[in-house]
């Protein structure tokens, strides 16, 4: 396996493929190492991924800053302080530690090196790699592209409205010893600002905006633009005149999804597959989690005994890609709608999920892009109809009232990751679920529903489920089904068999 790119997505894939017994070559183009990065925010879900990769010891010495509050001006012009359960990590040290771990476990690493071309056919690729010592030819079963955002324009990408991000760092000495280290997020009429203390003691400030809406040539005047944004901000005004460690940097930050993320034997990971809006601050976790899903799909594809199993692997990969991207785009749009300055053009243009491509209707890629668009729209429609939890406690389960499976519950077969493979697995589908559910609390769900196809008392159902789970778990399952309206009151003798 050849993995191209040693960011969180590529490193996660290389380590997981190694765990599954594959020989892995990791190719990284950066000449300087550890390389500086701006994606330092780690959301709590990263911990489970690190546990799965058995990488806790390797990351023990990586500088991290956690437990700092967030000062926020978003839904109104009033500033509020909220708890923050994420962390900020030294990304250069984080990536370097995972590279050392991969090498220690037998992953071959080429750096600096770059992918030149790929010839051959799926499952039998001839990969040409440029190194400091010349061209290298490598035979590979599969190629995983984790190179992140590319400067070239990819026509097969569906893009959200354009975004760019400017950033700079303030030295600790400039802010003084008593300066707070809180994260700051501020909505402005023409964009939003984010700031966070780094483990090094520096403070990073970022301004995200739409360059197409500006007439002040931001690419030519980045310092002026960033200082003016600080001056207009209630949370960053005090930083507008402070010295910076270096001149501001600027990068593209437009969210997108790639319609060609899966090709037989060649898959994309992380930002190469889909890029999140930076407002989420969850790019590292999403990149690593999707890499794990992609590895399971690719492992299944490589070890499949027939074309049906390979097709199932692809279906799993693409469904997870669409689900992850659609949920993020929908969440981002909802968050943009909450901004106190939401009537300005910048915010209105991002208040609903909107993706476009630059393809002509007769382009050869148009069909793939159209299929992806329909899949995303279907996912958005499902997200829209599923009601979020109200936050109120659900009524107690009536133990001596008959219940049954709701008539609009269905049993469907979906691609599901079990262990290190993708299999076709029965799952429960219902309008109040945002996706079919195959497992509940680690137990296959559909076999547990058989007793609910006819009217029954919860107290009896808890007893009948005792062979599969503890009584307390059985009760929680019934309460969850009732909270989702997947079970309903039933008259004696009523029947409600789900359809398949």
Give the positions of each predicted feature.
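Beta1/beta-strand and adjacent pyrophosphate-binding region of the FAD-binding site
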Residues: 1-9
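FAD/FMN-dependent oxidoreductases across multiple families
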Residues: 215-303, 308-333, 339-341
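Acidic, low-complexity/disordered tracts enriched in E/D and polar residues
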Residues: 367-451, 475, 479, 488-500
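Glycine-rich FAD pyrophosphate-binding loop
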Residues: 18-38
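Predominantly flavin-linked oxidoreductase catalytic cores and closely associated redox partners
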Residues: 20, 101-240
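C-terminal helical "tail/cap" subdomain of flavin- and related membrane-associated enzymes
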Residues: 299-394
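A conserved beta-strand/loop capping segment in the N-terminal third of enzymes
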Residues: 47, 51-97
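Short capping segments at the starts of secondary-structure elements
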Residues: 449-460
């Amino acid at each position: 396996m050849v993995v191209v790119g040693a960011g969180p997505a590529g490193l996660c894939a290389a380590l997981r493929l190694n765990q599954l017994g594959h020989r892995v070559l990791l190719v990284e183009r950066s000449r300087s190492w550890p390389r500086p990065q701006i994606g330092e925010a780690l959301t709590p879900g990263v911990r489970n991924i690190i546990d799965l990769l058995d990488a806790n010891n390797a990351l023990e010495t990586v500088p991290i800053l956690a437990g700092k509050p967030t000062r926020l001006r978003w839904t109104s012009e009033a500033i509020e302080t909220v708890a923050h359960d994420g962390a900020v990590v030294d990304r250069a040290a984080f990536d370097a530690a995972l590279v050392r771990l991969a090498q220690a476990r037998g992953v071959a690493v080429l750096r600096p090196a770059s992918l030149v071309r790929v010839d051959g056919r799926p499952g039998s690729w001839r990969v040409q790699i440029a190194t400091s010592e010349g061209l290298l030819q490598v035979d590979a079963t599969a190629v995983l592209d984790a190179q992140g955002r590319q400067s070239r324009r990819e026509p097969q990408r569906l893009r959200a409205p354009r975004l760019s991000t400017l950033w700079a760092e303030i030295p600790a000495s400039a802010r003084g010893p008593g300066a707070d280290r809180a994260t700051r997020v501020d909505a402005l009429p023409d964009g939003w600002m984010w700031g966070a203390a780094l483990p090094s003691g520096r403070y990073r400030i970022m301004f995200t905006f739409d360059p197409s809406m500006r007439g002040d040539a931001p690419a030519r005047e980045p310092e002026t633009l960033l200082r003016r944004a600080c001056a207009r901000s209630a949370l960053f005004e005090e930083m507008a005149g402070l010295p910076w460690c270096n001149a501001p940097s600027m990068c593209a930050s437009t969210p997108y999804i790639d319609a060609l993320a899966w090709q037989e034997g060649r898959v994309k990971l992380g930002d190469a597959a889909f890029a999140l809006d930076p407002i989420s601050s969850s790019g590292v976790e999403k990149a690593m989690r999707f890499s794990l899903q992609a590895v399971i799909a690719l492992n299944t594809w490589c070890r499949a005994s027939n074309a049906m199993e390979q097709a199932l692997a692809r279906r799993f990969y693409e469904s997870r890609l669409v689900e992850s991207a659609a949920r993020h785009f929908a969440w981002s749009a909802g968050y943009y709608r909450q901004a106190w300055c939401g009537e300005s053009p910048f915010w209105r243009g991002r208040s609903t999920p909107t993706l476009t491509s630059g393809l002509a209707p007769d382009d050869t890629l148009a069909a793939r892009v159209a299929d992806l668009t329909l899949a995303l729209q279907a996912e958005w429609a499902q997200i829209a109809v599923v009601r979020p939890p109200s936050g109120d406690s659900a009524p107690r389960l009536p133990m001596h009232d008959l219940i049954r499976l709701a008539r609009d519950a269905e049993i469907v077969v979906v691609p599901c990751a079990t262990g290190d493979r993708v299999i076709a697995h029965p799952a429960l589908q219902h309008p109040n679920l945002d996706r079919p559910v195959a497992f509940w609390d680690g137990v296959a769900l559909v076999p547990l529903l058989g007793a609910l196809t006819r009217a029954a008392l919860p107290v009896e159902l808890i007893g009948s489920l005792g062979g599969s789970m503890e009584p307390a778990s059985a009760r929680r399952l019934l309460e969850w089904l009732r909270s989702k309206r997947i079970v309903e009151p039933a008259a004696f003798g009523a029947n409600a068999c789900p359809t398949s």
